Amino acid sequence: MAASFSVPSMIMEEEGRFETEVAEVQAWWNSERFKLTRRPYSARDVVALRGSLKQSYGSNEMAKKLWTTLKTHQANGTASRTFGALDPVQVTMMAKHLDSIYVSGWQCSSTHTTTNEPGPDLADYPYDTVPNKVEHLFFAQQYHDRKQREARMSMSREERARTPYVDYLKPIIADGDTGFGGTTATVKLCKLFVERGAAGVHIEDQSSVTKKCGHMAGKVLVAVSEHINRLVAARLQFDVMGVETVLVARTDAVAATLIQTNVDTRDHQFILGATNPNLRGKSLANMLAEGMAAGKNGPQLQAIEDNWLAIAQLKTFSECVMDAIKSMNITEDEKRRRMNEWMNHSSYDKCLSNEQAREIAERLGLQNLFWDWDLPRTREGFYRFRGSVMAAIVRGWAFAPHADLIWMETSSPDMVECTRFAEGVKSMHPEIMLAYNLSPSFNWDASGMTDEHMRDFIPRIAKLGFCWQFITLAGFHADALVTDTFARDFARRGMLAYVEKIQREERNNGVDTLAHQKWSGANFYDRYLKTVQGGISSTAAMGKGVTEEQFKETWTRPGAGNIGSEGNLVVAKARM
């Protein structure tokens, strides 16, 4: 007879701690924060993936702050507006006026990769590039917050009352591109973002192999199910770390022309097929392969593809059915009846598979309908895709249970598109928040908008539910504009250009970089020196002799207004 096993107390304690943590996670998930979130895994799965050392992250506090900010905007029909920040200077200036910060993958790719090798937005930079930029900015935010506290606590109450308080700790939302590979790559990327300070992350539904900037051509989508896997992987990692990082699901389905696979039935309605029966057995890929075997290349191969596509009569299956019904030898009333029946059975919310759609078509009298989605596949094996707002809506329906915001990338600032997308997604997910890219890739002056329309665009689409809106590359463009115009003027007019265009404008607009030593924290670190040395230091950076004393006063030059002429005064003092 086998001896009974006596469970050691250590094992019981271990299981007790595990079960307690499982209950805590479940209670967390049941909170208002996650009432719209669907998870295909359990709290036990999450706790099993955690270590025994509990950790906390500053980014989690920022994530909670971001969530509150966005939900407040959603309730008020307003929007958090921001733009891509390049560096600590920009992020501290933005803090005075905006309530969130964006970190753009495009800007990082062009200006700040971890290999220092710049390039276009193809997500081919090392995957720690954007997390490192987040850390760069998050450290700066925390530093300027500490610096401000030291400065304010050195003031009297009256001085503090007169001095505006700046909340430097504005939540950062970062560009996660496509997740940078498979599930484990996405998990590790999201871990980095949390550790480096991101309050939110967006992930898009393009193929990671062929990823393009949202406003480039040649975009290839992944299946709906694959992108859901990315979102689930991100959420799982956030859960494992115990953080409430805001997750944004982006879709590029409006302008995409290709899709990796036809494995997901939710994509079937938008895949194109050849409808010309004369091409039966003559796939585009085979035609191109034959051309290459014959020694053709470049323009010759492009001509083969162009000619093939010109005669293929590419259509979605639904378009093919509707055209076939219109050409049937039946009465107009019967045509209308069959078209209505087709539309009722094949509406986008039903997400019919192609097999199901063919069965319905056959019931409508279309037994020998020719439509082949394999014939037009590219040399890489991609299927042709009919990008549209409706395709983005269908993806929004699928992504919403796994994300906090949905973002539809567009090719122009179009109110009609925005309205259709918002109403479409919210018809199934009325509480979901939406995001919008106020892209500098749009030629806004060519959009047909008046200046008034441009001014009102943000609040107008905010009322539709777009509660987070951002100019991805405004930091980049602002940096380029200021540098180019100043360099040109400086080359022509020397120091007068600097004084007129930079120094005086900093003073006139109250920009705190005018006193750049103070901005960089010289006073703050003097406090360290003096604290270590008993309250006095002969080597304090801001002691007697620092040139920044010149900026504590302004002088009025006759006829020039209160612009300051300390430059002349400095020269006079130097000659004394």
Curated annotation (Swiss-Prot):
Family matches, as PROSITE patterns: ISOCITRATE_LYASE
Pfam family, one: ICL
Protein name, UniProt field: Isocitrate lyase
Keyword vocabulary terms for this entry: Glyoxylate bypass, Glyoxysome, Lyase, Magnesium, Metal-binding, Peroxisome, Tricarboxylic acid cycle
CDD domains: ICL_PEPM
InterPro entries: ICL/PEPM, Isocitrate_lyase, Isocitrate_lyase_ph_CS, Pyrv/PenolPyrv_kinase-like_dom, Pyrv_kinase-like_dom_sf
DNA damage as UniProt keyword: no
EC number: 4.1.3.1
Function comment: Involved in storage lipid mobilization during the growth of higher plant seedling.
Catalytic EC class: lyase
Listed GO biological process terms: glyoxylate cycle; tricarboxylic acid cycle
GO CC terms: glyoxysome
Entry similarity comment: Belongs to the isocitrate lyase/PEP mutase superfamily. Isocitrate lyase family.
Subunit structure: Homotetramer.
Record-linked PANTHER family: BIFUNCTIONAL GLYOXYLATE CYCLE PROTEIN, ISOCITRATE LYASE/MALATE SYNTHASE
